[in-house]
Structure formats: structure tokens, C-alpha cells
Swiss-Prot record:
Transmembrane region(s): 18-38, 55-75, 89-109, 140-160, 173-193, 215-235, 330-350, 375-395, 422-442, 522-542
Main location: membrane
GO MF annotations, alphabetized: acetyl-CoA transmembrane transporter activity
Name of the protein this chain belongs to: Uncharacterized membrane protein YBR220C
One GO cellular component term: membrane
GO biological process: acetyl-CoA transmembrane transport
Cytoplasmic side: 1-17, 76-88, 161-172, 236-329, 396-421, 543-560
Superkingdom in the source lineage: Eukaryota
Recorded topology in the membrane: Multi-pass membrane protein
Amino acid sequence: MEPKRKSGSLAKHDLPQFYLLIMLYLAQGIPVGLAFGTVPFLLKSLAKETSFTSLGIFSMATYPYSLKIIWSPIVDSLYNKRIGRRRSWIIPVQFVSGFVLWALGWCISQGIIFDGVDDAFHNRGNGTLHSVSIKNLTWWFGLLVFLCATQDIAVDGWALTILSKESLSYASTAQTIGLNIGYFMSFTIFLSLNSSDFANKYFRNIPLDHGFISLGGYMKFSGMLYIVITIYIIFCTKEKPYVEYLPKVEPINTSDGGSKPISIEYDDGDVVSTQNTSSIKYIYRCFIKVLKLKSVRSLAFIHMISKFAFQCNEAATNLKLLEQGFKREDLAVTVLIDLPFEIIFGYYVVKWSSDKDPMIRDNRRLRNSTGTNKVIKFLVGDAGVLTPWLWGFLGRLAAAVLGSYVVKQFPKDGEISTGYFCLVIFQHLLGSFMNTVQFIGISAFHTRVADPVLGGTYMTLLNTLSNFGGTWPRLIIMSMINYFTVYQCTIPGTNKVYVTHGGSMQACTELLNGTVTILRDGYYITNLICIVVGLFLYFGYLKRKILHLQSLPISSWRCT
């Protein structure tokens, strides 16, 4: 008899598909890292007078990633049967994405877009920005994120069928590993290798004015990587490696143009029912049914409000450190340290999120046998599938509190001590790790409750709500920081002093050649508001509702 596989472990026959998903999510993480991290970083570090409102406007480039549900049913229903439902979209979208990345990289290298960011690499200047058009940057990177979001719809749907049922929970692990590696490549690793200070300090005997990799060069390399991955998908993959149809049955047409259900059998013996998923009308009708489910509406509301509590910390803390003089290559190192932790512990968070895993049962017994039961129950309630999400929420709140302390304690003389550097590392490690705990926990829950019949549409709906919950507050948060901040502008050679409430530093430094002094920093006020709102939301609503949702049967999430 074949030895029984351990509960919760990845099946060996699913390893090729698992690695393929990692590569697809890695490719997706490249433009995400550029739009969400690198470009705002470069804008703030190369032009410190860039206002937080301008950064908030650029954040609109990330909106397609949060609005992809609008065209998700189209991606789910229109496809070439010979190529496959998911490959029909992944292949052309990745080809176009690769071309756009390469073309955008070429334009940046030539100074046509993002003028000045690569000047030091081409002997055109010292690397300072030249009147960058935030509007143009937003449009170009918005296009890139739109393509990335479309690819994400297809990959999320593919993850539901490319893995066997026994390994389905590892789709969220592949997503976490791939997205993190791609994000770190485009954000942390790129910023380190792009920095002249980093290269001169650690690798060069003779200092130069530029780092190892330019932004344009990196984007052209990323475009070629997209093409290589796409060629592999064309020639080396199948749409359904472990899914076989039962004996062929001709669909029976119904009055509404659809078809009666057909059974699909997976290799692991699970049988699900499907209909004519090539009908856009059918997919949209099912989509509306899903939105009407009480459980989905409750989860949607949670997604829309839960991330407000951390937005100031995660969007502005690193930028405030840059503004005060923290070197971007040092900040990149703090982010780099986090990568192995997220990959290693991601596996255990998946097991933690499985209600079939012994870890949860052991956790329940531990609560009943220790004196910490009351404290734990007060904080996260009874153990369940979403317990990691609850702990992650509290951990990110703690990281937000620590973020204000880290910015406040920045050395007045600008000299970074080892102790302070370790404090920055710890704060970032806490925040990003707890973010990963929440992400894997909720992704595993999404995979568990999503209806395989709807494939990418259902997963995209849940993931879109989660993403948009972290996107919509960002412009508001950035505007709040600007509004609550009071600047003093001193004009040299005169006795004139202007006090601006919620104004722009750029007007003072560029138009008046003045010196800016911050009298009141709106970052602290905004972060405090977010934390207080988060505490009220968690103990007043979120914890209670999450405990209810995780106890619902799978039938509460299905419309087919």
C-alpha cells in the first residue's frame, strides 16, 4: 500500500505546477514593485520637495489592480478552447507586458519619461529629477498595472485547477513567494543596486556617480524575462495537467442560452459541477449571485475598511525616514532582511490557516490547558481558519505604533547608530511579516471558499476587494498628512517668513529659493487617527464578524 501523505503537505506530483505558479506570480510582482514601491521612493529621494499629495496622485496608477473585477468575467468567459481557458489570456498579456516594460525602459533611458532618473548612468547629469510630469508617470505605470491585473485574473483562476485538490491551499503560498520575490527584485534589490552610495561603499575601490543598474536597464531586462517565461508557458505547459473530464456529454441547451451542468472529475477524486463557462452572460449572472450572498457582502465590507488602520504607516513611514535623511540603500537593506523570513514562515502560516491541520487542534487544546486562555480569547477568539488574519491585524497595529516612534527618534545630527538601525529593521520586519501572515491567511480562506466553477471571477472578486481596501485610503491618507502639516518658509536675504498650512514645500524651494522648516508634522496626527480607528473597528466589529465567517459552511459561499 502507498504510504499516506501527511495532511497539509504539498503533493509531489504538484511540484512542477507549484513552481510554475511561483514564476507567474514573480513576473506579476515586478510591475507591482515598481508602481507601489520604487517610483514613489525615487520621487521622494531624488526630489525631497515632492509633496505627499503628488505621491497620492501617482498612487492612482495602482487602481487597476484593485478594479480588475470589472473585466474579470470577460477574462473568465472568452478563450480559445485549443489553447486553454487560462493560457489564452496569460500568453498574449505577458507578451504585451514584456513589450511595454521594454519600451518604457527605453523611454526612461532616453530621458523621454521620468527625465533625470537615469542621467548619472548616461553622463547627462548628477541624477536629480527635471520637472517630472506626475500625470505622465501615472498613465504609463497605470497601463503596466492594468496588464499585470489582467494577468492576475487568469493566474488566480488557473491556480484553482492546475493544482490537485489536496494541494490547493498551497496556491496562496506560491502567490506569496512569487509576489514577494518579484516585489523585492523591483523594489529592495533594485534600489540597492541602483544606488551609487551602496555600490561605492561595498564593492568599488574607485567611486562612481552611479550604481550598477539603471531604472531603464532594469525595466528592459524585466521585459525580456516576461518574454522568456511566456515562451516556456507556450511550449512546456498544459492547461489542465491533473484534470480529466468524465466521458463526453453533449451539453443540453436551456431557454436562457446556457447549458445544463456537466461533471468534472479531478485526479484526487473530487467531482464538481460546471456549466457553459464560455458564456459571458452566464459568468456575469453568477457574479451577481455571488455579490448577493450575505457571507460575501460581509467579507467585502471587512476588506474595504480593515486596512485603513495601517495605511499611514505602510504608505508614509519609509518616505518620512527618507525625508529626514535616512539613506535609501540602508532602507533597502532593512527590507531585504525580511525576504527570507517571509518565505520560510509562509509555509507554516498556510498550515496554521488549515482547519484540518493538527496545529489548530493543538492550539485549541493549549488554550484549554493554560492560564492564557482568557487573554487569547479576548484578542482573537476561538481558533479557526482566519486566526492568522486576526493576529496579523493586531501585529500591523503594533507596527504602526512603532513606526511613529521610529520616525520621532530619528537622530537630529543625521548619524545613524547601530541601535537605531536595528530598531528600523525590527519595525519593518514586524510590519511586513504581519502583513504576510494576514495575506496568506486570507488568501488560503479565499481559495477554500471560492467556487471552482467560476474560477478566476470568484477569486478575483475576493482578491480585488482585499486589494482595493488597501488602495482607496492611500490618496486620502497622503492628503491628510499634507493637510495637517504646517511648513515655515524662510526667504534668504530677507526677513520674510511664510507659514503654510497644508501647502507644498516645492513652491518654497523652487519658486522662492527658500528654506523649509516643519513646524507641525501631519504624519504623526494621521497615523494616530488610523491607529485609533483601527482599534475601534477591531474590537467593535471585525473580530466578531471574522469569527462568524470562518464558522460558516462552504455552501454559504457557493451560488452554483
